[in-house]
Amino acid sequence: MSKLFLRILAASTIAVGFLALVSIPSARAKDEPVATAALTESDLAFLKKGLAKKPKDSELGTLKATAMMLALYSQNELTGSDAAKAAGRRDLALTIAAALEKKDFAAAKTALEGWATAKDGDPKKTVKLHEQHAFELSELMAQFSLGRSGGRHIEADLKAQAAKLTDVKLATELGGRVATIGRYAALMPAGDAVGPKKQKWDDLCNEMIKLGNDAAAEGAKGDRADKPALAKKLAAINLNCKNCHDVFKNN
C-alpha cells in the first residue's frame, strides 16, 4: 500500500458524514457534517490538560462544552458498526459534563480516564443533548474565546488562518468544530431570538454549519487542499460570526 494512498485515506476520515443532533428546520441541515476522529482526539487532550489541575471558574464553561461536543460526536455515530460503543462514549461524555456542572473535578477526571474502555451503551436510546446538564449558549460559545480566557482560541485562529493560511490541519479542525457548534446553536437560540429574529438565528446557524462543513471538507484533502480557497472559507465563517453578533449583540 503506497504512502500516498495512506495519506489520502487518513485525510478522508475527517470528511465522513455523521447524523444531525436532531432535525434542524432548514434545507441547510441536509448538508453532511464532517467526521470526528481528529476533533475527538483534540477534545480529549483539551479535557485531560484542563483537568490535570483544578480548573479556574473561567475555564469551566469551555470544559463542559467540550464534553458536550464529545457527546454529540458519539451520538452521531449511533448507526455505524460500533453503535453500542458510540452510545457508551456518548453516555460517558455526559457523565463528564455532569461532573463538571457539579464542579466534581475528580469524578470528571475519572470518567475521562475511562474513555478508551467505555462500556457499551444503548444505541436505540435517544438523548436531546442540548437539554442535558443545564448546557447554556454562553458555555457553547465560550469555545471561541482566547485560551488565556479559558476558551479554545477558535475566533483568533479563524482570523489568523483566514489572513494567512499556514496550517491546513488546524483549518480543518476549525471547520469541523464550527459546524458542530452550529448544530448545537441551532437548538439553543439566544434569548432575543424571537419573532423575525428567530428566523435570522436559524439562517445564521444553518449557514454556520454549511460553512464549517465546507472548510473541513476542503482541508481534509490535506496536501491537495486549495489553500486560497480554504482561507476564503474561513473568512466566510468570520463574516458569519460578525453578522450574528451584529444582530444578537449580547450573545
Where do the protein language model's features map onto the residues?
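Polytopic transmembrane helical bundles with strong interfacial aromatic enrichment
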Residues: 10, 24-30
